[in-house]
Amino acid sequence: MIQKLRIAIQKSGRLYDDSISLLKECGIDLRNVKDRLKTESDNFPLEVFFLRDDDIPQYVEDGVADIGIVGKNVLYEKCKEAEIIEELGFGKCRLALAINKNEEYVANYLQGKRIATSYPALLQKYLDENKITAEIHEISGSVEIAPGIGLAEVICDLVSSGSTLFMNGLKEVETILESQAVLVRNKSLDKEHLELVNKLLFRIRSVKKAKRNKYILLNAPNDQLSKIFELLPGMKSPTVLPLAEEGWSSVHSVLSEDEFWEKIEQLKAAGAQGILVVPIEKMIV
């Protein structure tokens, strides 16, 4: 019997779409996923469970699912023993403290305050580490309205852009945790399942690396190639092809997204012309 890898992902919410997209970018075809609790892949030994995000760490720890995609904030709040094997780069946010925008935030401001949150364990850990005594009010949603209705002076909630805080007259004052989607696994997987995890991880890392890089093609005079090579390390070294016009070559290489615009300006200054930039779908290294 062919072993299948069981992965748990969020059934709805902010991580669902990106999780499905990641699997598709990894070349994994899923059967109909709409309004399903479980589905399978037709071209990879993978079974997908659609769960509440709060339940994913427990399912992975108990071995009901072999791996899962979940936010760090949820994993750490639940204090589960699932092992993080890859940060996925989406669903980025931070768990932060916020107060009334007109209040001055000073040392010991939190002492004795009422704090509303959906993350009591992470908040309590932060308070203990900083020797702060405060009253935690656990609520399941719409945390940002707590100060406005007199429930708390402070909130501890997830923040992405900060627009929700702004609309509710709040300002961010402390970051407790930087979070993003992570791939986690059960710590007791057998050899066969570990091999499947590694195959999937290889695909995920190839997709991630491709997103961080661009394929670049340019034309340059031969007497400027040495300068251009210094700017284009590529994966090993740039590919150089002679052009029909004597004294010119076509140079192909890979540029990191982080330094892309700076390098383009330097390449133009070094004599590069006709620069083309192409997205990379997969990058195998």
Question: Predicted segment positions?
Answer:
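Pocket-flanking alpha-helical
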Residues: D54-Y59, V64-K80
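Small-molecule-sensing regulatory modules
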Residues: I2-P45, V70-R94, K101-V285
